[in-house]
Amino acid sequence: MSDTTSLNVPELESPPIERVELESLLVMNIIKHCRDSFPNMGTIGQLVGIDIDGVLQVSSSFESPSVLENEESAVNKSVSGKARQAHTEAMLNRLQYIGAVTGHVGWYLGAYVSSFLSSPFFVETQYAYQKANPNSIAFLYDLSQSSNGTLYMRAYQLTPEFMAAHEEKTWTASSLNSHNLTPSNVIRELPIVIHNSHLATCLLHSLSEPPTPASTLTAEAALEDCESNLPLTETFSNFEVSLGTRYRKNIELLLESTDEFHYEQGNLGFHQRQLAREQAKIQQWIAKRKAENANRAAENLQPLPLDDWKRIFKLPAEPRLLDSLLISSQIMKSTQIDEQSSAFLSKLAGVRNAYAS
């Protein structure tokens, strides 16, 4: 009998995720959690499911402790992170106990006007998820953009370029260039498919529509009734173009991100000026040392080393470009107002055509 434990079985890698499928009940649970926690934007939860042939099938979810506002400090971040990890492990153990799927495939969060990308919490959390499972996703529900009846949900992953750059943790200009990392390819969006469970589908098919009562009105009477109910004056209520809070908030967020970007650019400009001054001093020192070596060569003396400037001068450290990269990516996200204002622009076009005629 052969010993199978000595065989080196290659580990099979799952293909990259191309689509995310969720059940409608799961989506309703996420919406309820985010709405009940509003206005707290630290609402997060965990996603459970399985990925099959590039399709991530999310079957269930559960809530996690919310993110605190003072969680930026190292102590609070460590304590809150351990509490969430312990809560997640306990919930997964309970799911395993009842025989449910326990594959941890990502997390969800509630956001306001998609103001999530510039937060270090989102990037660090998603990086940790994809480091453990490359097919993990971040599922976003935007409450403000879903207030007018349009369901705004997105599934994101960090791109391989960002994951490779984050692995180095240098975030210098040379690192970003070597990985071809730009603000446009920090994250990638995955298509979402929402469907009903088989039991819900069977229930919907089993429901019967109530019979429509037969009309006793004649055609002439129905026409007279319609004409009598017509309004005397024309109304343009359907062409109301109220901007709403989400558009104003989107502009405010865009202005705040622009101010933060200018601040980061100022820090980078200060570093470049300081670096130029130090390099000028180094060049002057090297020129002076070369002249001194020429005099020593005329006196048949050994030349002095030219790299002693490394002990005398210290070049300023290059600033990390992670914040600038995320802010630029958030600005690109905020400028995509056309995705959120299609109905608003349609009403404007209708008003223009009405007055033009």
UniProtKB/Swiss-Prot annotation:
It is found in: Cytoplasm; Nucleus. Keywords: Cytoplasm, Initiation factor, Nucleus, Protein biosynthesis. It comes from the Eukaryota. CDD domains: MPN_eIF3h. One of its GO terms (cellular component) is cytosol. GO terms for biological process: formation of cytoplasmic translation initiation complex; translational initiation. Residues 20-162 form the MPN domain. InterPro entries: eIF3h (IPR027524), eIF3h_C (IPR045810), JAMM/MPN+_dom (IPR000555), JAMM_MPN+_peptidase_M67A (IPR050242), MPN (IPR037518). Its main location: cytoplasm. One of its GO terms (molecular function) is metallopeptidase activity. Component of the eukaryotic translation initiation factor 3 (eIF-3) complex, which is involved in protein synthesis of a specialized repertoire of mRNAs and, together with other initiation factors, stimulates binding of mRNA and methionyl-tRNAi to the 40S ribosome. The eIF-3 complex specifically targets and initiates translation of a subset of mRNAs involved in cell proliferation. Belongs to the eIF-3 subunit H family. PANTHER family: EUKARYOTIC TRANSLATION INITIATION FACTOR 3 -RELATED (PTHR10410). Component of the eukaryotic translation initiation factor 3 (eIF-3) complex. The eIF-3 complex appears to include tif32/eif3a, SPAC25G10.08/eif3b, tif33/eif3c, SPBC4C3.07/eif3f, tif35/eif3g and sum1/eif3i. This set of common subunits may also associate exclusively with either moe1/eif3d and int6/eif3e, or with SPAC821.05/eif3h and SPAC1751.03/eif3m. The eIF-3 complex may also include SPAC3A12.13c/eif3j. This is Eukaryotic translation initiation factor 3 subunit H. It comes from Schizosaccharomyces pombe (strain 972 / ATCC 24843). The gene is eif3h.
